[in-house]
Curated annotation (Swiss-Prot):
InterPro entries in the cross-refs: Beta-tubulin_BS (IPR013838), Beta_tubulin (IPR002453), Tub_FtsZ_C (IPR008280), Tubulin (IPR000217), Tubulin/FtsZ-like_C (IPR037103), Tubulin/FtsZ_2-layer-sand-dom (IPR018316), Tubulin/FtsZ_GTPase_sf (IPR036525), Tubulin_C (IPR023123)
Origin superkingdom: Eukaryota
Protein's UniProt name: Tubulin beta-1 chain
MF terms in GO: GTP binding; GTPase activity; metal ion binding; structural constituent of cytoskeleton
Natural source organism: Hypocrea rufa (Trichoderma viride)
Stretches for region Disordered: 421-446
Length: 446
């Protein structure tokens, strides 16, 4: 049985580093070594390997990944890294000039020159698929390439493959850790695109990752490698049901149908368990209640917004390893009953659970959490405030206008983001009996 295919795009420095960590993780789970040769032990590993990998000759598997950047540095780092031999050499597409943290360069000038080259590679990968399911993109929203060129690619791919799913793993700017001054501009302009063109966006944020590393994993000085390791654990968890036989959410579209009640509200927060410091997990057995409690703990969410400030529209949990389905179902029911204030009551059964038999490497059981909560508006609100403060004074605007952008675009992006925040707020405040107010206008029965 031929399975579905995901073309994986990595744009910019952040996207490539996170993406490479992801490929490293899933290669290990499928029993592939650093050059893509299969040496695994179980048939399950091979069963749906073709979702993410193409089979080359002599038992070698190649990731269906396209690596994109506007400067060669990141590519060289990936190539010379431990898994550099895994990727197809033709799938590295890079410019020479860099985007200089400027969204306009990534979207309109430098990125636009490179985009056709990238689309050729994407087209070639898509044509080799028997039944293309969709695209998965890793990028950051704060820089120039991942945000500007990433969103350009998303809209171009949308034009060409309008009926395919588009999932993005987006690293959103964090409240205290800022890499560039113009982050709010880049992020707002990107959000403007993602709201329209992405089907689901998993929001990840560096500060939340730092907090997890320091608070839970007890690392005193976390490196980007540690952060990427966390993200790749979540990405691997989210894609488990695509890669291993299971019952629920077995493709991108099914997950989206279960998770997105209104098309614009497709920004998810993610969590993972068990998170223990590297030496500690051998000292205790992990139980399903513990996993559930940990993955739904606000401290372990990988986006800096606290779900207790909003309500869940929907959420999905993926358990991996030998867990009893009944135990999982009971546990999730308990969670929903205890925390009913944090779930909207007008979507019944809004928790989905999926189980897959194969655990991640080094763990007996694990769980991943994906939540569509109205609290995610905190992120947009925060970025929006920073955006307004700078835009009111027209600070740094010349960098964008000199690349041919119009102030109008900034205004549109700002109002689109404000609309998004108020939509989240509206559904947070809605209750099950709100429908009655419309019935006054109904004609009287004779």
């Amino acid at each position: 049985m031929r399975e579905i295919v995901s073309v994986h795009l990595q744009t910019g420095q952040c996207g490539n580093q996170v993406g490479s960590a992801f490929w490293q993780t899933i290669s290990g789970e499928h029993g592939l070594d650093s050059s893509g040769v299969y040496g695994g032990t179980s048939d399950q590993q091979l069963d749906r390997l073709n979702v993410y990998f193409n089979e080359a000759s002599n038992n070698k598997y190649v990731p269906r990944a396209v690596l994109v950047d506007l400067e060669p540095g990141t590519m060289d780092a990936v190539r010379s890294g431990p898994f550099g031999q895994l990727f197809r050499p033709d799938n590295f597409v890079f410019g020479q000039s860099g985007a200089g943290n400027n969204w306009a360069k990534g979207h309109y000038t430098e990125g636009a020159e490179l985009v056709d080259q990238v689309l050729d590679v994407v087209r070639r990968e898509a044509e080799n698929c028997e039944c293309l399911q969709g695209f998965q993109i890793t990028h950051s929203l704060g820089g120039g390439t991942g945000s500007g060129m990433g969103t350009l690619l998303i809209s171009k791919i949308r034009e060409e493959f309008p009926d395919r799913m588009m999932a993005t793993f987006s690293v959103v700017p964090s409240p205290k850790v800022s890499d560039t001054v113009v982050e709010p501009y880049n992020a707002t302009l990107s959000m403007h695109q993602l709201v329209e063109n992405s089907d689901k966006t998993f929001c990840i944020d560096n500060e939340a990752l730092y907090d997890i590393c320091m608070r839970t994993l007890k690392l005193s000085n976390p490196s980007y490698g540690d952060l990427n390791h966390l993200v790749s654990a979540v990405m691997s968890g989210v894609s488990t049901s695509l890669r291993f036989p299971g019952q629920l959410n077995s493709d991108l579209r099914k997950l989206a149908v279960n998770m997105v009640p209104f098309p614009r509200l497709h920004f998810f927060m993610v969590g993972f368990a068990p998170l223990t410091s590297p030496g500690a997990h051998s000292f205790r057995a992990v139980t399903v209640p513990e996993l559930t409690q940990q993955m739904m703990d606000p401290k372990n969410m990988m986006a800096a917004s606290d779900f207790r400030n909003g309500r869940y529209l929907t959420c999905s949990t993926i358990f991996r390893g030998k867990v009893a389905m009944k135990e999982v179902e009971d546990q999730m029911r308990t969670v929903q009953n205890k925390n009913s204030a944090y779930f909207v009551e007008w979507i019944p059964n809004n928790i989905q659970t999926a189980c897959a038999l194969s655990p991640p490497r080094g763990l007996k059981i694990s769980s991943t959490f994906v939540g569509n909560s109205t609290a995610i508006q905190e992120i947009f609100r925060r970025v929006g405030e920073q955006f307004s403060a700078m835009f009111r004074r027209q600070a740094f605007l010349h960098w964008y206008t000199s690349e041919g952008m119009d102030e109008m675009e900034f205004t549109e992006a700002e109002s689109n983001m404000n609309d998004l925040v108020s939509e989240y707020q509206q559904y947070q405040d809605a209750s099950a009996d709100d429908g009655e107010e419309y019935e006054e206008d109904a004609p009287m029965e004779e």
